[in-house]
């Protein structure tokens, strides 16, 4: 984790000199924060791309969920230190991702509004529904990353289950061919 990592370790891994690192960062914690911020910014970009795809809102909402879970999983696995800290110090990660969470919830709202306007979703309150959707997805991140959800299922079958739950919760009116 971050605590066991030295500035020398970081300098070697980044192929930079320690002096160079200290020019930009006062501590290894600042470097850690910069890495997390950078990863969250890339994640936001991926989410924005998914939300901007020219597909119907019912497909788009699933695309957002898949993008979120797969991207978080890749970030955590790509960064060994982040992986350890993600599971050990979830509160620190939580504080750092507030802006990402805000942007993601706004994307959910946008897609839910689209779906409601197109009469695809039967939801009473878009804002509350977006918040609930966001926290549901966030709540399954750790089991998803660890491969504990539907480990015996192939991806297509697993996502069909997700689609059924999501579409049911959103009162999805278009029933034919709703899965990705």
Q: Model segments located where?
A:
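Secondary-structure edge/capping motif, primarily at the C-terminal ends of alpha-helices
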Residues: 50, 79-86, 144-148
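Amphipathic, non-transmembrane alpha-helical scaffold segments
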Residues: 32, 36, 40, 94-105, ...
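Hydrophobic alpha-helical connector segments
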Residues: 34, 38, 45-74, 129-133, ...
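C-terminal peripheral helix-coil segments that are non-catalytic and often amphipathic
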Residues: 106-118, 131, 135-180
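Helix-turn-helix
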Residues: 2-30, 34
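Short secondary-structure transition hinges
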Residues: 69-109, 117
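Conserved hydrophobic residue
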Residues: 3, 120-121
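Membrane-interface starts of transmembrane alpha-helices
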Residues: 122, 126-130
């Amino acid at each position: 984790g971050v605590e066991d990592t030295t500035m020398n370790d970081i300098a070697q891994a980044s192929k930079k000199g320690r002096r160079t690192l200290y020019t930009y960062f006062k501590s290894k914690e600042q470097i850690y924060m910069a890495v997390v911020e950078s990863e969250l910014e890339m994640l936001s970009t991926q989410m924005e791309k998914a939300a901007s795809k020219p597909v119907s809102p019912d497909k788009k909402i699933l695309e957002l969920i898949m993008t979120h879970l797969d991207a978080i999983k890749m970030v955590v696995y790509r960064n060994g230190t982040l992986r350890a800290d993600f599971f050990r110090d979830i509160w620190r990660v939580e504080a750092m991702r507030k802006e990402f969470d805000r942007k993601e919830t706004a994307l959910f709202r946008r897609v839910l509004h689209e779906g409601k306007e197109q009469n695809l979703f039967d939801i009473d309150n878009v804002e509350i529904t977006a918040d609930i959707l966001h926290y549901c997805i966030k709540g399954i991140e750790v089991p998803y990353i660890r491969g504990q959800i539907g480990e015996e299922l192939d991806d297509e079958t697993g996502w069909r289950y997700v689609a059924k739950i999501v579409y049911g919760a959103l009162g999805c009116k278009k029933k034919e061919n709703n899965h990705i």
